[in-house]
Amino acid sequence: MKNEAPSLPDLLASLARQTRQPDEIVVVDGGSQDGTVALLECWRDRLPLRIIVMPGATIAEGRNRAIAEARGEIVAVTDGGVVLEPDWLERLVAPFEGDEAPDVVSGFFVADPRSPVELALAVTTLPDAGEIDPARFLPSSRSVAFRRSLFLAGLRYPEWLDYCEDVVFDLRLQRAGARFRFEPRAIVRYRPRPTLTAFALQYFRYARGDGKAGLFAARHAVRFATYCVFLPLVVWLRRWWLFLLAGLGAAAYLRRPYRRLWRRRADFPLGWTARAAVLIPLVRLIGDGAKLAGYPVGLLWRARRYGLRRTWRSIPERLPPPPGV
């Protein structure tokens, strides 16, 4: 974590409330300047904290160091800026103690929006648990546990990648034959980005990470074809059936966010729900625009350093972090 002082007390308090207490908590700080480390020190008498300061460390470097320092066989991973449900650790660890124990347990995460903008971001970008296909789900490292023996066997978070590092780690675990189990009740809560500008930057970085790692190329190709080929043709040719096709496509693209918003309508004021409904199409456009901008930057980064034929499958996991783009 880095500069998480505002949200850190809630995270630490949620750790203290766990129905199954952790044997140890290894925290790596990436060089915070806002008092994060001092706050951690204040909690040493309430939690079994081990604090490691690594100024300038990337997310992947910090996680790898924390796992290397851990002593237990099962490692549960979360992030700064979240709040854990009281039974999060208990539910995340329980499958390892049963029959046919897995190697990885995928927890879940839900949004905790504090404004109509955050609500719109939540329903547009985050799936509900019922939408997840456990066989294909790639867990976020906000909520995941795995056997440390996988790490000791050489599987690492990719230190050459600044964003999407948990996706690459998941894919490499799958490729190594790790057995996954989905536990949707192991929940962490977190706030979406507070502004559309912050959201755009987040999605630019995610798409740049996809380009760097060679992730989801088909999805990005469809997005480029839609915005850079199909929609310009619709405007240029002005055929009614093309406008109809574009409208049907937009309706299908927006259907799922509106369904999520409808399911959550009782949880928020009516005014919030109405404003979020208006914002959903804008969120889609901003997110797609950010991805259209970020993905080529990532491709260029990979082409210059490794060549476009190399992807997360062949780029070594342990490399000094390259300069940012």
Give the residues covered by each predicted segment.
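Short aromatic/hydrophobic "clamp" motif used to bind/position activated sugar donors
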Residues: V75
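Short, acidic, metal-binding catalytic loop of nucleotide-sugar glycosyltransferases
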Residues: A13-P22
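Membrane-embedded multi-pass helical conduit in multi-pass membrane proteins
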Residues: C228-R302
